């Protein structure tokens, strides 16, 4: 049996056998330690940025601005319906041929859809994670009375849900023509008139556009705060711009179903 220690002629002196680790050269141990991966070095800068609260707010703000730009362009395209069927149908054809001849048929439209989808996903995920982080940071309810917030602020989350459900309905209605009974492929003007000739089509669209307006009013101002306002004067200007932009977009979108209901567009 091998013993860990042995005693020589001097009983008071005990000699210990060196362990396997002690017999290993110090240089080899150091090189082995250096070869081990360090977790801190594996985390990339984009991942650190995304994990931070500022990063999530920035993603939410930038994606919101992308969607806002799309809404402005979409509203301007919708208003072409007031110039007649030929003008509106030509606009629908241009959407599928934009970028030609460099891009193939509908490639430009699909590129816009992909960018918009990424913006929607980034906006929704960052909003959800920020909400969960805020709840975890304040698990207990405050006893004192919370400051009064605007109606748009209190309904921000539900407004996002309403808009998300409307997007699904809108695609099934005017893109895939699944729920539009009187739809005709290749006739966007007639399809819009058919949709807004029903009470439920008008109800769904108008409620959704009101939710969009409230969401834009609060979201535009929140994005400005996240990206930096700068001064009190600029703050007042951006707040007025948020209110005006929400009003113009809501009125522009709602004007189309109202025009169909009143017979202005038929």
Predicted features by range, described:
Residues 2-266:
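Membrane-embedded alpha-helical bundles that constitute the cytochrome b-like, heme-associated redox core
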């Amino acid at each position: 049996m091998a013993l860990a220690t042995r005693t020589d002629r001097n009983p008071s002196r005990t000699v210990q056998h060196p362990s396997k680790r002690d017999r290993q050269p110090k240089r080899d141990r150091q090189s082995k330690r250096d070869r081990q991966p360090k977790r801190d070095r594996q985390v990339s800068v984009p991942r650190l940025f995304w994990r931070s609260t500022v990063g999530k707010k920035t993603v939410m703000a930038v994606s919101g601005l992308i969607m806002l730009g799309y809404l402005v362009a979409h509203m301007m395209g919708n208003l072409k319906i007031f110039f007649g069927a030929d003008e509106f149908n030509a606009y629908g054809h241009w959407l599928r041929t934009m970028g030609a001849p460099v891009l193939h048929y509908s490639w430009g439209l699909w590129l816009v859809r992909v960018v918009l989808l990424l913006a929607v996903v980034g906006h929704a995920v960052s909003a959800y994670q920020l909400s969960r982080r805020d709840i975890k940071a304040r698990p207990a309810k405050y006893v004192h009375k919370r400051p009064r917030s605007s109606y748009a602020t209190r309904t921000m989350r539900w407004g996002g849900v309403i808009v998300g459900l409307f997007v699904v309905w809108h695609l099934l209605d005017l893109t895939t023509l699944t729920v539009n009974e009187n739809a005709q492929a290749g006739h966007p003007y007639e399809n819009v008139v058919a949709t807004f000739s029903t009470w439920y089509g008008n109800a769904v669209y108008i409620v959704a556009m009101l939710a969009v307006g409230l969401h834009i009013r609060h979201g535009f101002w929140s994005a400005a705060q996240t990206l930096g306002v700068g001064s009190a004067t600029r703050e007042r200007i951006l707040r007025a711009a948020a209110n005006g932009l929400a009003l113009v977009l809501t009125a522009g979108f709602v004007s189309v179903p109202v025009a169909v209901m009143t017979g202005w567009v038929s």
